[in-house]
């Protein structure tokens, strides 16, 4: 659990007082000439091994990289852990619970601390209760955030003082990924006299945002983050590394959002699941760092694990622009050029697979409904059935009404070109006399306070404010479902008329039900298009062709008349985006001095009435018991593309939900129910979110001969269809072991550990699916739930699974072993189903057998401290 470095291959780094590890020499000692052919990712992973791997494992591990083999697990030691306040807080609740468990067994709780530097940014808890047309929206939304989250923030403040090695950036300062890009990542570290590449894991699937800097940053679940925090290696096999050559240059008026939505469609079709992508070529070299970051941010939407760019002059220019010290920028250049991470040194890199994408093919685009990879060129809105006749009855909202238009998300607000484009479009629209439609709830929520400074410098913030896009917060807001309440009159009209209402946002996900319960569908668009849709007021509007309004002379105004030119965008950036703005924001923010005193108890004083923070139960009762994998009944039989939003939603809690009823019983007023996400530190609230998504389709929930959509289950053997939570409670009372049967891509979406915790607390012991998304599979293992995969070409339909059956798993559990699921049907017939055990490494088997990572931590800690 230490952070010890090796000594072999350690050398002085030319032109500095630092040392570095000469990975090239280590590779060449095994295979002369091999280093020049290695992809960027392989070089960074190899450096990590040379510096940290146990010497006796080094040669075998490096050979996997040199020979592009995937036969051996090797350790990876990320330099940092970054967390947001939902999963980060949940992880810290687990660590506080671990301290209690250690103390109960006679250990010293104060010894439980993160070993790896950990940064927690509070960005997920602000709801847009007041829209951007309210001049005091920011202050009002922040006050509500503090009131609703007092329990959570009390706990987070305690952790900052009680745990070593944790830095906390409090609420109201920005979004984790954008702060990571603009400030936290040094690209190259200088620690203990050694220079080495920044690498990290983050408790959010969009952590790869900083891959744009050439930093390997991957999203993990909270459980895996806890493991890394405590100094454990993250074991991996060499990932598939795919080169993506970008050619051509974007057409005039095309934004990075258009490019990334086109890439999302292209890469999803190319099946890049779990791979590390490396973008190169003339097209990649010409992209600004902001444009690269927009691309890297949407790595999970591609289905990939990482989306890397090489270090080059664009990287250095961006580090300078964002106020990094000149000495640090020089270190990045020196290290990259010495260690072979500079773009020129990668001309001979060989990729097992290379894809080609022409940037000049990209046209103006939105994505939706329902999926980020459902790309629609704006020139084809009518042909695709999205735009159509706009029915504007006086005094009523039109069909397809845009009820939310949000410039939001680190995906786009970390890119000055996208933000400035929105400001210029707003200025042009104001000059033509155009206005926002009154039913559109508009908001601007940048991921960094620097955005406000450069918009003010360019005199564009007032232009956005006059169209209702005032700053409502510096947080994730609408992008993670915290879009806040609608005007009650508008909401009632949506309900009464069963209106097809929509949201348009510059975010990265648009799954049904995610953005707002009353926005039936959502579309992703660039910030300037979001402004245009607020003026149009309906998704039925053909944004390229229809008339947005009449100017002061009565002439029709279309999108083309207000869209800013690339030259103007670039000129405004050159004049208005400055390093001192970033320094002014970040220097005070990172002046972190924490008093670690004897005054703070190492054990948290849990508040018994809290619905936000509660001592976790993972070391006691049934969760400490054995899983037999026998006599399991299905809790749900599900189709393809089940997301973590289905498994444990994040959005607002409704009174008629199981969690809402519980919070009401606990005395919370409905307006302070907050979101599911904010209650994940309290397992009693959070477990009631399991499968609580109203869009769930559980194939067992058959009513009148059809599958009924909703948070529903069927209790067996009675065959009673009921709300999911009532079914879970019934099975918990019976101590009935459960199983879930699912289709392909099970668990895609956010890296939400409660998507695994919830099913484990319900009594689920195994999940059989056609395929698992990477982070969710790891979380299942971390909770002691066995992931099993149907053999290729087989699925639930092959075996006619309807939910009346009982399931057993037999065979010896080992990495990727062949196991057998025995199905016993209602009539007594037994069927054998061959499956693959998706515990992929020996380390995962050991975690599973311990009951999960939290149980394993406690065992290991007590053993090491009682020796």
UniProtKB/Swiss-Prot annotation:
Keyword set, alphabetical order: 4Fe-4S, Iron, Iron-sulfur, Lyase, Metal-binding
What EC designation does it have?
4.2.1.117, 4.2.1.3
Q: Which GO terms describe its biological process?
A: propionate catabolic process, 2-methylcitrate cycle; propionate metabolic process, methylcitrate cycle; tricarboxylic acid cycle
Binding site residues for [4Fe-4S] cluster: 410, 476, 479
Please indicate if the UniProt record lists Iron as a keyword: yes
On cofactor binding, the record's note says: Binds 1 [4Fe-4S] cluster per subunit.
Q: How is its activity regulated?
A: Inhibited by ferricyanide and EDTA.
Reaction catalyzed: (2S,3S)-2-methylcitrate = 2-methyl-trans-aconitate + H2O; citrate = D-threo-isocitrate
Q: Give the record's pathway.
A: Organic acid metabolism; propanoate degradation
Q: Name one GO molecular function term.
A: 4 iron, 4 sulfur cluster binding
Q: Which Pfam families match?
A: Aconitase, Aconitase_C
Give the required cofactors: [4Fe-4S] cluster
Question: Which InterPro entries does the record cross-reference, listed alphabetically?
Answer: 2Me_IsoCit_deHydtase_FeS-dep (IPR012708), Acnase/IPM_dHydase_lsu_aba_1/3 (IPR015931), Acoase/IPM_deHydtase_lsu_aba (IPR001030), Aconitase/3IPM_dehydase_swvl (IPR015928), Aconitase/IRP2 (IPR006249), Aconitase_4Fe-4S_dom (IPR036008), AconitaseA/IPMdHydase_ssu_swvl (IPR000573)
The record's top EC class is: lyase
Q: Which GO terms describe its cellular component?
A: cytosol
Q: Entry's PANTHER family?
A: ACONITASE/IRON-RESPONSIVE ELEMENT FAMILY MEMBER (PTHR11670)
Q: What does this protein do?
A: Involved in the catabolism of short chain fatty acids (SCFA) via the 2-methylcitrate cycle II (propionate degradation route). In vivo under anaerobic conditions, AcnD catalyzes the stereospecific dehydration of (2S,3S)-methylcitrate (2-MC) to yield the trans isomer of 2-methyl-aconitate (2-MCA). AcnD can also accept citrate and cis-aconitate, but with a lower efficiency. 2-methylisocitrate and isocitrate are not substrates.
Q: Which family does it belong to?
A: Belongs to the aconitase/IPM isomerase family.
Q: What else is known?
A: Together with PrpF, able to restore the growth of prpD mutant on propionate.
Q: Which NCBIfam families match?
A: 2met_isocit_dHY (TIGR02333), PRK09277.1 (NF006757), PRK12881.1 (NF009520)
Q: What is this protein called?
A: 2-methylcitrate dehydratase (2-methyl-trans-aconitate forming)
> Per the UniProt entry, what species is this protein from, by scientific name?
Shewanella oneidensis (strain ATCC 700550 / JCM 31522 / CIP 106686 / LMG 19005 / NCIMB 14063 / MR-1)
The gene that this protein is the product of is: acnD
